[in-house]
From Swiss-Prot:
This is Kunitz-type trypsin inhibitor IVTI. Activity is stable between pH 2 and 11. Monomer and dimer. InterPro entries: Kunitz_inhibitor_STI-like_sf, Prot_inh_Kunz-lg. Keywords: Antibiotic, Antimicrobial, Fungicide, Protease inhibitor, Serine protease inhibitor. It comes from Inga vera (River koko). The lineage of its organism: Eukaryota, Viridiplantae, Streptophyta, Embryophyta, Tracheophyta. Activity is stable up to 60 degrees Celsius and declines rapidly at higher temperatures. The keyword Transit peptide does not apply. Inhibits bovine trypsin but not chymotrypsin. Also inhibits trypsin-like enzymes from midgut of several lepidopteran species and inhibits larval development in those species. Has fungicidal activity against yeast C.buinensis. Has a bacteriostatic effect against E.coli. Is not cytotoxic.
Amino acid sequence: EVVLDSDGEMLRNGGKYYLSPASPIGGGA
C-alpha cells in the first residue's frame, strides 16, 4: 500500500518508503 501525505512527501509504510504511487522506493513494488 502506498501512503503519501498531502504534499506527496515520503512516509514510512510497512518498513518501505514511497515517493509516489508510480515510484516505490525500497523494493516495495
